[in-house]
């Protein structure tokens, strides 16, 4: 993980999981050794604790508003993040909206939710979830928990027309915008 406190950014190394260029997932980025490590579009080399601490060091404020009880009715809060993805040979750094397809065409609203205690208890390795989540360090305020798997309100997958092949290494940069 690379932290640039002056520019309020955190950059991490990830690997593309090509399965989710065709299959749906609610898992954006997960630590490769977590129990959900192979369920995400991007497999990361950073732990939830390291990622949480890096976002705080970069100036982020965790929302800490998500619980197991309120998750299906609550939208995650916390510092707003612009997320971009780059890799060797990429035409440019692509925004998260460009690399992740939302079946409803809605924009992602990525927030530093926090949730370090739950993350350490559950050991899923979840870093970035595509709906509001009480475990992931960062998640998407556009949808509440259960929107993908339980209620079928939306489907997410990687944008195969933009992203490189399975196993390609990439960097993901999180910029704190508010």
Protein language model annotation of sequence segments:
Residues 1-178:
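Long, low-hydrophobicity ectodomains and other hydrophilic envelope-associated domains
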